[in-house]
Amino acid sequence: QRQMCIRDRYKIMEERWDIYDKNKQPTGRIMKRNDWTLKDDEYHLTVLGVIRRPDGKFLITKRVMTKAWAPGWWEVSGGAAQAGEASYDAVLREVKEETGLDVKGAEGGYMFTYKRENPGEGDNYFVDVYRFTLDIDDSDVNFQEAEIDGYMFATTDEIKAFAEEGIFLHYDSIKKVFE
């Protein structure tokens, strides 16, 4: 079982997120990470960074089994934008932290936003989805062991098969990014 170092755990506990209104405009208010007290018309911002190789395969990662939510599921890199952090800067940071890849200046960029609403749960969020094309192989990937239990370069059909098994996070919301 992998353990996060104390510094990383403290950093996560101290993380702050901007609060947005239903039109994705900042309210000027900030919340603590995972402090699910958002009203039904308030949101925080998350990002996903999909990495595609020129051969059409996508870099997907497998969540560690110690995750409280969706352990062992496949996903693409992503996470919450921190307070004061622009969406693009957040996706650059998340991809770098989780995979070791620098997508700044890579072909591609922002594709679309979707909204996830969980009435009464205090956890509503926008997801900005990005896709970047990079000519990479195994030697380029340096994944974050505290969060990721492995990775693969998958075809669209392989990703769809994981989704059909019910083990690919957010597939229905992001499937058009794999086209």
Spans of features found by a protein language model:
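A short local loop/turn or secondary-structure capping micro-motif enriched for an aromatic residue
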Residues: 35-38, 67-70, 151
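A glycine-rich, hydrophobic loop/mini-helix early in the fold
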Residues: 46-78
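Short, small-residue-biased leader/transition segments that mark boundaries at the very start
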Residues: 1-6
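Nudix hydrolase/Nudix homology domain
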Residues: 12, 71-72, 83, 110-117, ...
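The catalytic Nudix box helix
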Residues: 59-60, 76-109
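Short loop segments at secondary-structure junctions
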Residues: 23, 53-56, 64, 133-138, ...
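Acidic, metal-coordinating catalytic segment for phosphate/diphosphate chemistry
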Residues: 13-48, 54
